[in-house]
């Protein structure tokens, strides 16, 4: 019962915050806020530079594996637990999911800079 109540409160709170986030920016639409500030001068060109999607994919991959290391670092302390099989299976599942994601990205040529 307690877990069900926590889940329902989290879902309701998340839904409310998402609805507010979509509704709130539509109240005040100012075109001047979208323009870059150029110290009083009119902008010569667009300030919105294109972003490399390849760099974004490599950065996300780096963050995922950095998170993996952060999650696996407490394993030596977790070995002191009585249920080692549960801890090892959780670590194996985590590493397997990340390895499958890396293999998929590699096969889709997401890590190559040139085509």
UniProtKB/Swiss-Prot annotation:
The gene is MT-ND3. One of its GO terms (biological process) is mitochondrial electron transport, NADH to ubiquinone. It is a multi-pass membrane protein. It comes from Podomys floridanus (Florida mouse). It is an enzyme of class 7 (translocase). Its EC number is 7.1.1.2. Its main location: mitochondrion. It is found in: Mitochondrion inner membrane. Core subunit of the mitochondrial membrane respiratory chain NADH dehydrogenase (Complex I) which catalyzes electron transfer from NADH through the respiratory chain, using ubiquinone as an electron acceptor. Essential for the catalytic activity of complex I. Pfam families: Oxidored_q4. Belongs to the complex I subunit 3 family. Keywords: Electron transport, Membrane, Mitochondrion, Mitochondrion inner membrane, NAD, Respiratory chain, Translocase, Transmembrane, Transmembrane helix, Transport, Ubiquinone. GO terms for molecular function: NADH dehydrogenase (ubiquinone) activity. InterPro entries: NADH_UbQ/plastoQ_OxRdtase_su3, NDAH_ubi_oxred_su3_sf. Core subunit of respiratory chain NADH dehydrogenase (Complex I) which is composed of 45 different subunits. Interacts with TMEM186. Interacts with TMEM242. The keyword Transport applies. The keyword Lyase does not apply. The lineage of its organism: Eukaryota, Metazoa, Chordata, Craniata, Vertebrata. The chain crosses the membrane at residues 4-24, 55-75, 84-104. This is NADH-ubiquinone oxidoreductase chain 3. It catalyses: a ubiquinone + NADH + 5 H(+)(in) = a ubiquinol + NAD(+) + 4 H(+)(out). GO terms for cellular component: mitochondrial inner membrane; NADH dehydrogenase complex.
């Amino acid at each position: 019962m307690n877990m069900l109540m926590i889940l329902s409160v989290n879902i309701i709170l998340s839904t409310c915050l998402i609805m507010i986030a979509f509704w709130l920016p539509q109240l005040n639409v100012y075109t001047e806020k979208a323009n870059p500030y150029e110290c009083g001068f009119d902008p010569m060109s667009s300030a919105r530079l294109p972003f490399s999607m390849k760099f974004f994919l490599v950065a996300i991959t780096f963050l995922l594996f950095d998170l993996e290391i952060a999650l696996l670092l407490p394993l030596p302390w977790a070995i002191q637990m009585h249920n080692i099989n549960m801890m090892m299976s959780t670590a194996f599942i985590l590493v397997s999911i990340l390895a499958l994601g890396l293999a998929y990205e590699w096969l889709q040529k997401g890590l190559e800079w040139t085509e």
